[in-house]
């Protein structure tokens, strides 16, 4: 502890508030909150502190703090400070749209939609999120959309559509259809998502048998798979409360400085989904629980429950209730206590399965970042942006950018680039264009300026990046390095911005850390290239179909953003854009 901190510790009040630990460069490395600032801050410098806290404390060179009126205010302030400074030791939740939802819109003529958007921009009833990777969610959605005659068209057409002819729509485009007409189907959909799926299973079984009798074995297998999906989905509704309330039940388990949390989400009394998390923390257990739970309900949860059951002190539960406007309770007995015990057991299992790997990975990542920081003599390495290009014979030229924050990839910040310069014919040209376009207008869509740019390649790629940065007057602000390969095409050295080289120890954690980064950007670039190439080949095939001209192809590609979505679309869906005979030809491709 230096003299500056010793002096500040004498002046810190015994009041609630937030504290900010800073390193030797003045960078905020941790934000915490406390009911008593003075007592909490002094705990970091006790002799019997654990290894994780010791690691954090060894980096501390200064502290700032903000006094507030109560714990509720400190919780809100902590959240804002973490968002502002993004400290490397705050292992908080990041919003994710990875898991899909199925949405029934609240329009006059409702539709069933498949969405990854958790912001609820479209008004309606959201079912999900569906995290089970074994469930073929989109196929299940397609089947549900076909058997319930809700509106399929984005806008009502002026004449009847094929969905009305084949019995998949009530036909509001040609006759009066009221909301009451949809009610039986809406109830049946809700029953399905409540686990009452017997009638749908019977329909699938009937189609499976009919397909087998016609020797259409692929179709028969498809219906069998859908039935299995339906069974897996229904099994998630095993725990049902007699009271049809929207409630969450939280269990957690702590081992040293690692916490695992499980949240059971109940909708209308039925268990709909499970959310789990395991993370390292550097504060008191009550503090990190408050922070993580606040983060979850303020940023990640799409539907807020009326009540949350959690084993915490009355004081902490009151703080959460006031902050989130949700009732937080601690059940002492009964079925809610039993389910909380189940959630606790789940949290214990997560800890058993992931603890060692989490600690090992985190230590390697932090150590590798520190080693790279020292090696390059860079002030901070919070954010790194890594670039690669992909093409074959100068066709379907693409660039890709991946982002790492505190040594962890942030997929929400990944970006793809189509090479626009038709005269560009080398990796040097592609890199130059991509770097220029990334930093020309540092808009919010790209995130903040990185602490380091890494390019996949040696001196030519580093030179290309530096040229674009120099043109933008950023060459003295953002350092650039390249990951270069030897004669055997194996990465073996770092090429710095001054073109000096640093040989890498192929047995070191840093080497494997950089190799993983390089593999990630290469994978991302290659997948983008393959998709673009496949799309190009698919487009060429489309042009060979009779009565399918440029305008119709453009409309197809406008509605179905990816090739997979075109392939998944039924003949009936495609026939909304092209004649039905043309739609059948497309399905043959």
Swiss-Prot record:
It is found in: Cytoplasm. Pfam families: GIY-YIG (PF01541), UvrC_RNaseH (PF22920), UvrC_RNaseH_dom (PF08459). Residues 14-91 form the GIY-YIG domain. One of its GO terms (biological process) is SOS response. The keyword Hydrolase does not apply. Signal peptide: none annotated. The keyword Lyase does not apply. Disulfide bonds: none annotated. HAMAP family: UvrC (MF_00203). PANTHER family: UVRABC SYSTEM PROTEIN C (PTHR30562:SF1), UVRC/OXIDOREDUCTASE (PTHR30562). This is UvrABC system protein C.
């Amino acid at each position: 502890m230096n003299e500056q901190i010793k002096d500040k510790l004498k002046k810190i009040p015994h009041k609630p508030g937030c504290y900010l630990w800073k390193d030797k460069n003045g960078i905020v490395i941790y934000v915490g909150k406390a009911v008593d600032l003075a007592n909490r801050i002094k705990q970091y410098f006790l002799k019997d502190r654990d290894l994780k806290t010791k690691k954090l404390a060894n980096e501390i060179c200064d502290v700032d703090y903000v006094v507030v009126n109560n714990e509720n205010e400190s919780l809100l302030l902590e959240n804002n400070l973490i968002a502002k400074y993004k400290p490397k030791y705050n292992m908080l939740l990041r919003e994710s749209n990875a898991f899909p939802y199925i949405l029934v819109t609240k329009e006059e003529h409702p539709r069933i939609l498949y969405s990854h958007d958790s912001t609820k921009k479209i008004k309606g009833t959201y079912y999900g999120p569906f995290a089970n990777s074994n469930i073929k969610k989109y196929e299940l959605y397609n089947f549900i959309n076909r058997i319930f005659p809700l509106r399929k068209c984005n806008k009502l057409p002026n004449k009847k559509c094929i969905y009305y002819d084949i019995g998949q729509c009530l036909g509001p485009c040609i006759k009066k259809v009221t909301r009451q007409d949809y009610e039986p189907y809406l109830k049946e959909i809700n029953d399905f998502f409540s686990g009452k799926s017997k009638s749908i299973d019977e329909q699938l079984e009937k189609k499976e048998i009919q397909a087998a009798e016609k020797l259409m074995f692929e179709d028969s297998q498809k219906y069998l798979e859908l039935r299995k999906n339906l069974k897996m989905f229904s099994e998630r509704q095993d725990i049902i409360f007699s009271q049809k309330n929207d409630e969450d039940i939280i269990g957690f388990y702590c081992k040293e400085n690692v916490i695992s949390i499980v949240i059971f989400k109940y909708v209308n009394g039925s268990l709909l989904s499970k959310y789990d998390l395991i993370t390292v923390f550097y504060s008191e257990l009550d503090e990190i629980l408050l922070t993580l739970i606040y983060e979850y309900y303020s940023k990640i949860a799409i539907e807020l429950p009326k009540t949350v059951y959690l084993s915490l002190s009355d004081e902490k539960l009151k703080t959460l209730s006031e902050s989130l406007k949700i009732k937080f309770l601690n059940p002492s007995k009964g079925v809610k206590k039993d389910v909380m015990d189940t959630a606790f057991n789940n949290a214990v299992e997560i800890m058993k399965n992931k603890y060692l790997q989490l600690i090992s990975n985190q230590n390697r990542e932090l150590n590798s970042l520190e080693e790279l920081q020292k090696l390059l003599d860079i002030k901070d390495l919070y954010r790194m942006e890594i670039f690669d290009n992909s093409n074959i014979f100068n066709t379907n030229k693409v660039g890709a950018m991946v982002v790492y924050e505190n040594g962890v990839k942030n997929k929400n910040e990944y970006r793809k680039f189509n090479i626009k310069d038709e005269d560009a014919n080398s990796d040097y040209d592609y890199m130059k264009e991509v770097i220029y376009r990334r930093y020309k207008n540092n808009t919010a869509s790209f995130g903040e300026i990185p602490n380091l740019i890494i390019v996949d390649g040696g001196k030519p790629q580093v030179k290309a990046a530096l040229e674009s940065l120099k043109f933008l007057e950023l060459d003295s602000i953002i350092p650039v390095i390249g990951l270069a390969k030897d004669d055997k095409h194996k990465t073996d050295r770092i090429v710095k911005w001054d073109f000096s080289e640093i040989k890498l120890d192929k047995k070191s954690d840093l080497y494997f850390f950089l190799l993983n980064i390089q593999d990630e950007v290469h994978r991302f670039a290659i997948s983008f290239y393959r998709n673009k190439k496949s799309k190009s080949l698919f487009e060429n095939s489309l042009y060979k179909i009779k009565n399918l001209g440029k305008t119709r192809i453009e409309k197809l590609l406008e509605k179905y953003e990816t090739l997979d979505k075109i392939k998944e679309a039924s003949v009936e869906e495609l026939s909304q854009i092209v004649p039905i005979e043309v739609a059948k030809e497309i399905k043959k491709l």
